[in-house]
Amino acid sequence: MKKLFLTIFSFITVMLYSQKVDSNKIYTASYYAYNTTRYTASGQKFNNYGLTAAHKTLPFGTKVKVTNVNNGKSVVVTINDRGPFKKTPDFKYYSRVLDLAKGAFLKIASAGAGVIKIKYEILE
């Protein structure tokens, strides 16, 4: 019974962490920030200038490399929240997959950009 449990647990873990991302596909990302104290879906205190991001399904703690396709700048973020949930008709051919904390966004784009085209890669 113990072996069966470990086998199933290992299989599920591998499936969760082996989510495929098409590294050639272009997605969109934006940033979010708050003026008051908020907590992320993972229970961490949100830091406007942290290197964190929200994703709908990736496990909390996953490291993701995000690259701005317009300027080639990259940042590595940790998933600690859920989202994005905003619909983007202006980017109907792209899928918004990440909301970056403002600090992470500013590493790869100006705040005035608002929404940027990205590629991303799951690191761990």
Task: Give the location of each predicted region.
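Hydrophobic h-region of N-terminal signal peptides that target proteins for export
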Residues: 9-18
